[in-house]
């Protein structure tokens, strides 16, 4: 059935593929980034057990300094260094020379991811909507996350992996949204043109802008009021996943 092109009411285009963001689109994070402190505490505890002598307050402060520095360094390139890079750089700030592949860095990232997963839940509508869209379209996932292994685990945990023909995670390919490159990789893997694809995501500055800059139509899933970027306008706005069945399938 792939290759069938359907007319999308309100978007005015033919669609072969639907691409999705992951976080706060298909799966939901507890609001306010409440996961950060408990995740950092787990990471810090792992490091302390392995001989690192740093107070949690100092560790937390330096972690955010390093994280912000990494994003500043990659603002133009839109690269996404793996989370291991952050851990390694934090440790070096305190005089501990562990490279990104060392067991203590990899292990620390792992415990951070384990805790993070506790703050993620599946959207109640996700499985049914994906199942129904899968009958007519190629599906792809394009996610920004510095721990790609965690994304794969979440997809397996919630039974999402099977729905997608391509899955791209920024931390795995070292490129993040809104870079057109990550969208283009997804399109190439699916074998579809940008004009025949729709992207669904919750962040105007990343999902909508990245899709539009690549020539893909964008549907913003607005779960809560967000600051709209004036020069980035989605083609459609929905409040929940089930509305996609009307936007995309009601032809």
Q: Which residue ranges define each predicted feature?
A:
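Asp-based, Mg2+/Mn2+-dependent phosphohydrolase catalytic module
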Residues: 2-18, 28-30, 34, 50, ...
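Charged catalytic carboxylate motif
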Residues: 39-42, 86, 125, 129, ...
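A short, structure-level motif marking secondary-structure boundaries and short turns
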Residues: 28-30, 71-73, 113-116, 136-137, ...
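Residue-level preference for well-ordered alpha-helical positions
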Residues: 44, 48, 91-92, 187
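Short, acidic loop-to-helix structural element flanking the phosphoryl-transfer center
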Residues: 77-85, 100-104, 110-139
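Short acidic alpha-helix initiation/capping motifs at coil-to-helix transition points
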Residues: 34-43, 80-91, 145-146
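Conserved phosphoryl-transfer catalytic core
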Residues: 23, 35-74
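A metal-dependent, Asp-based hydrolase signature
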Residues: 57-110
């Amino acid at each position: 059935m792939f290759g069938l092109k359907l007319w999308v009411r309100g978007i005015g285009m033919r669609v072969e593929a639907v691409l999705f963001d992951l976080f706060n689109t298909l799966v939901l994070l507890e609001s306010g980034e409440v996961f950060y402190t408990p995740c950092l505490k787990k990471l810090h505890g792992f490091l302390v057990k392995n001989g690192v002598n740093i107070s949690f307050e100092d560790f937390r402060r330096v972690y955010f300094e390093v994280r912000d520095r990494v994003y500043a360094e990659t603002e133009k390139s839109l690269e996404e260094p793996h989370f291991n890079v952050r851990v390694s750089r934090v440790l070096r700030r305190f005089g501990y020379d562990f490279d990104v592949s060392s067991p203590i860095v990899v292990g620390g990232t792992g415990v951070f991811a384990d805790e993070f997963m506790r703050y993620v839940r599946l959207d109640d509508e996700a499985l049914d909507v994906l199942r129904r869209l899968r009958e007519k379209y190629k599906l792809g996932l394009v996610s920004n996350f510095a721990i790609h292994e965690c994304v794969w685990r979440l997809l397996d945990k919630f039974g999402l992996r099977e729905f997608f023909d391509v899955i791209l995670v920024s931390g795995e390919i070292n490129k993040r949204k809104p870079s057109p490159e990550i969208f283009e990789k997804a399109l190439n893997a699916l074998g579809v043109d940008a004009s025949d694809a729709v992207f669904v995501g919750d962040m105007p500055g990343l999902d909508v802008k990245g899709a539009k800059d690549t020539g893909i139509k964008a549907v913003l899933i607005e779960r809560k009021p967000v600051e709209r970027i004036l020069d980035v306008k989605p083609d459609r706005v929905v409040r929940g996943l089930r509305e996609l069945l009307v936007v995309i399938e009601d032809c």
